[in-house]
Curated annotation (Swiss-Prot):
One of the primary rRNA binding proteins. Required for association of the 30S and 50S subunits to form the 70S ribosome, for tRNA binding and peptide bond formation. It has been suggested to have peptidyltransferase activity; this is somewhat controversial. Makes several contacts with the 16S rRNA in the 70S ribosome. The gene is rplB. It comes from Phytoplasma australiense. This is Large ribosomal subunit protein uL2. Residues 252-263 have a biased composition (Basic residues). Pfam families: Ribosomal_L2, Ribosomal_L2_C. GO terms for molecular function: rRNA binding; structural constituent of ribosome; transferase activity.
Length: 276
């Protein structure tokens, strides 16, 4: 994927960039794989905000993605590469030999007409899915399961991948892009290759309105709020925060504090913690 930049003919276009969508082959999604998508605006089932700065945005439908890749030993052919408004990665529509259609995350290098297959005996080829124990050390993978049969949970966004660095008994050691090294059961599945659309993170939205189209609402500084809304709020004019360290809106220390639960059961599977 390439990035397309605009000439600064208006204030909104100055510094703005968009994806060239050169890899996209159709603008019409597969109807049988679309379901309604309700915008929760960052609220939970009690109506309370659990994720800030969410809401609004254009109406969209959810594309049903096959994260499990459990259709074994049936060859599928890539019919289209499509844009998905619900994620940063592109998706590929697969026509299987038995007539079924499924969407998968489109890895880098996957093109229309390419054949893919899932199963323990699959070839080590981009787009194929197989258990981690059957994949050679040094291979780059994505859409990695944490529990066998649950579906991929790691390395699913644009440009994401992990590398297999060794095997230990029933576990496989993965190096993630965050530099974290962790154990994953060898019976968990992963797909060969890295996710495409890798330049997505370089896109400059250019104006606030474009973020609103995506359902992203403004982020207000704590120092601009009242003291009953944020620990940084209040004071006369541009007052300092008046605390030893920056605080979250809920009064907890922000920046530089480890937020992971010390008693989390999966801590023993993390060999080296992430550095970024």
């Amino acid at each position: 994927m390439a990035i397309k930049k605009y000439k600064p003919t208006t204030n909104g276009l100055r510094n703005m960039s968009v994806s060239s969508f050169a890899e996209i082959t159709t603008q019409t999604p597969e109807k049988s794989l679309l379901v309604p998508y309700k915008n929760q605006a960052g609220r939970n089932n009690q109506g309370k905000i659990t994720v800030r700065h969410r809401g609004g945005g254009v109406k969209r439908k959810y594309r049903l993605i096959d994260f499990k890749r459990n259709k074994d030993n049936i060859i599928g052919k890539v019919a289209t590469i499509e844009y998905d408004p619900n994620r940063s990665a592109n998706i590929a529509l697969i026509f299987y030999a038995d007539g079924e259609k499924r969407y998968i995350l489109a890895p880098k290098g996957l093109t229309v007409g390419t054949s893919i297959v899932s199963g323990p005996n699959s070839d080590i080829k981009v787009g194929n899915c197989l258990p981690l124990l059957n994949i050679p050390v040094g291979t780059t993978v994505h859409n990695i399961e944490l529990k066998p049969g649950k579906g991929g949970q790691i390395a699913r966004s644009s440009g994401a991948s992990a590398q297999i660095i060794s095997r230990e008994d029933k576990y496989v050691l993965l190096r993630l892009q965050s530099s974290e090294v962790r154990k994953v059961l060898g019976s968990c599945r992963a797909t060969i290759g890295e996710i495409g659309n890798e330049f997505y993170k370089l896109i400059n939205y250019g104006k606030a309105g474009k973020k609103r189209f995506l359902g992203i609402r403004p982020t207000v500084r704590g120092s601009a709020m009242n003291p009953n809304d944020h620990p940084h709020g209040g004071g006369e004019g541009r007052a300092p925060i008046g605390r030893k360290s920056p605080m979250t809106p809920w009064g907890k220390k922000a920046r530089g504090i480890k937020t992971r639960d010390r008693k989390k059961s999966s801590n023993e599977l993390i060999i080296r913690r992430r550095t970024k």
